[in-house]
Amino acid sequence: MPTHLEGDLVVDGHRFALVVGRFNEHVTEDLLGGALDTLERHGADLDEVTVVHVPGSWEIPVAAQKCARTGDYDAVICLGAVVRGETPHFDYVCSGATSGTMQTSLDTEVPVLFGILTTDTVDQAIARAGSKAGNKGREAAEAAIEMATLMPKLEG
């Protein structure tokens, strides 16, 4: 029989940092609210959660990396919103935020969760921050809890 390992959704003392971009704040605040509510519902003491605000999604990876390297957190949740405009700037920001968060996770072996919306319109971003399409902040927080509880099991 194969061995199956998976995390669960019980915080059980795990510590979390959230790195939140302020750009498109009307969207990112809803993502943050969803993430914090989810962490609390699964047992987190919000007094033990750190929220780091950065100017925008471009700055998220470096702040996430600093958090991950402290050793104080079992997972880092990245929340932001990038909405396509008329120039290639959207592509550069999305690419940098995506690769930066993934590289941070790989380099530090701390789960760094990608809750950065990359949408064509503001309405799409709003829908993914709590209206029609759920709340991607909640989903990122659930994934963070699951990964935080899985990682110790992988250390063998």
Curated annotation (Swiss-Prot):
The EC number(s) this enzyme carries: 2.5.1.78
The keyword Cell membrane is annotated on this UniProt entry: no
Gene coding for it: ribH
Domain of life: Bacteria
GO cellular component terms attached to this protein's record: cytosol; riboflavin synthase complex
Catalysis performed (reactions): (2S)-2-hydroxy-3-oxobutyl phosphate + 5-amino-6-(D-ribitylamino)uracil = 6,7-dimethyl-8-(1-D-ribityl)lumazine + phosphate + 2 H2O + H(+)
Name of this protein: 6,7-dimethyl-8-ribityllumazine synthase
Organism, as annotated: Salinibacter ruber (strain DSM 13855 / M31)
Coiled coil (UniProt feature): none
Annotated GO biological process: riboflavin biosynthetic process
Pathway stated in the Swiss-Prot or TrEMBL entry: Cofactor biosynthesis; riboflavin biosynthesis; riboflavin from 2-hydroxy-3-oxobutyl phosphate and 5-amino-6-(D-ribitylamino)uracil: step 1/2
Organism placement in taxonomy: Bacteria, Pseudomonadati, Rhodothermota, Rhodothermia, Rhodothermales
